[in-house]
Amino acid sequence: QIVYLARLHGFSKADATAEATAILEQLGLGERLGDNVETLSLGNQQRAQIAAALVHDPQVLILDEPFSGLDPIAVDVVAGVLQERAARGAAVIFSSHQLDVVERLCDDLVIIAGGTIRAAGPRERLRDEHSTRRYELISSGDAGWLRTEPGVEMINFDGGYALFDVDEEATAQRVLRRAVAEGDVASFAPQHPTLAQIFKEVIQ
């Protein structure tokens, strides 16, 4: 079936067979080359459908929920194939509710809810736009002093670990200076929201 689809796009029989074999092996279906789609598991059927979309080496690839029904290993395999195609210059567009995968793969994002675009743009710009003044501190000393620090709202605290919000950036710099004075600081960094957190924010 995959060979037939390649033939429809002008491949010779030999080239179609070679291309179909290569993409199926790349997607982890090398041992199932002669099987009918109906005999495959749902996850393998999904991978076979992706192979059908890729076999003619399209320059624009539009996929609807390509990771649906896949186990974590298969997700990584398919993600790697899509990244490889994008690196070769193909435009890869896909919809997905698996936001951790979307965040890992995509350079540009569009969040749609109720038929309306709620947010769109480069991934890092969206993260910056929806960032709060939240910081994480990891130090050798006890970070309990943060609970009484002006302009600081403690979110989580455990010994030398603290997650907290500040009212302004100047407060964050003041906190860092005191943290250094209190003991060795292993890490002090702003916390950017995940795509899942941005999604929840923009659809509310």
Regions found by a protein language model. Name each.
Residues 167-204:
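C-terminal coupling/interaction segments
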